[in-house]
Amino acid sequence: NAGKQGQQIVYKSEKPLGAHITGAEPAKNWTKADGNVYVTRIPNSVFGTYNPYTTLVSGDWFIAYMTAHTGDIFLNGKSMYEVKTLDEVKAPKVYEASWDPDFTLYTWYTEQDDEKDETVIYANFQGKDPNKEDVEYTARRNCFYPSEEHVGFITLSGFKVSKAATQWAPPTAYQEGMIGPHWSKGWIIEDCEIFESKCSGISLGKYRQQNNDNKWLKWKYKDGTQTERDC
């Protein structure tokens, strides 16, 4: 429900940063596949209508050396590195351009088992036992985000908020975030620690416009000036 001007609805952690809103779930039941590589399976029913492990990050002006999924795998609170093939999980290589090159050896890969309707995750934990570590997978698209527009005058105060499978949010698209008002007004987001969103942590961006949603990517749209140049 929305608040009113001068009458905010307040969500506040009793202890500053003591409460944690997360879009992740524990990843359990790992079995050893090969060397340092383990595998686990997640029923697709867990994800409802949005499976982060079949959804690729995409949108206008998104350019990357590799197109990743919106889902992620976390080891002790830190996101591991998705790779394109199972072979890259079995024999990972250091990515020197990373802020933490050594951690780039902690890789994961996903595929679908259509017969069993399951998401299959392979991960290289570099000798660690994932059944004894804190391993999580992204299960939700957002953490604190109304499903409807115009839910105004909300305060979010003092929470840790992390690990959402957010989509790319260019100005030509529906701009979602891990936290966001979804085209509402009067929101206050304060004293929060926000981390490990796949894309946007906080989005104050626009609503969905069906005929103007990632139009450059979907329809190779060109504005008037570009059309003139082509002519």
Model-identified regions with their sequence ranges:
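Extracellular polysaccharide-degrading/modifying enzymes targeting complex plant/algal/animal polysaccharides
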Residues: 1-183, 188, 193-195, 201-203, ...
